[in-house]
């Protein structure tokens, strides 16, 4: 999961980069929904949360219901299959895959090749220091917060 230190740093960058209020957000590998709730609380108009773990999706659905937050839409799906079939554009796509996942480099590649970002949209992939995405299409910058790295992509 994204540390509080890294999350604070990320949202500080986003505050100066993209308008979260009114944004359509896709949260990939959402887990318990930490980032989902953060985007929702900052004014996103919709947050689609994807994870293949049923318990995570059930938790996000239950929490969103308790918070009476109907902009959060949790969906149990394999992230890569979802990206292969998605035809919706998003203003912000955030991915927090397991650091040991070998397919991390494929996330931004699929987002960019499938043209899933809206105009001026932003894709952020969280990863460890061992993963280098700087040669990928659309790469803009890398930000490091301790052991957490964020790679930013746009059209």
Show the residue positions of the predicted features.
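Class I S-adenosyl-L-methionine-dependent methyltransferase catalytic core
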Residues: 1-155
């Amino acid at each position: 999961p994204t540390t509080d230190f890294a999350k604070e740093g990320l949202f500080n960058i986003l505050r100066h980069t993209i308008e979260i209020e009114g944004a359509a957000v896709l949260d990939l590998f959402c887990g318990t929904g930490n980032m989902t709730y953060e985007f929702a609380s900052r004014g996103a108009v919709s947050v689609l949360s994807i994870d293949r773990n049923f318990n995570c999706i059930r938790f996000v659905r239950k929490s969103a219901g308790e918070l009476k937050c109907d902009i959060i839409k949790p969906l149990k799906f394999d992230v890569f299959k979802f990206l292969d079939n998605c035809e919706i554009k998003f203003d912000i796509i955030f991915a927090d895959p397991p650091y040991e996942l070998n397919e991390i480099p494929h996330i931004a590649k699929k987002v960019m090749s499938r043209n899933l970002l809206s105009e001026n949209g932003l894709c952020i992939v969280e990863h460890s220091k061992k993963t280098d995405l700087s040669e990928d299409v659309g790469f803009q910058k890398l930000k490091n917060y301790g052991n957490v790295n964020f790679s930013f992509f746009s059209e």
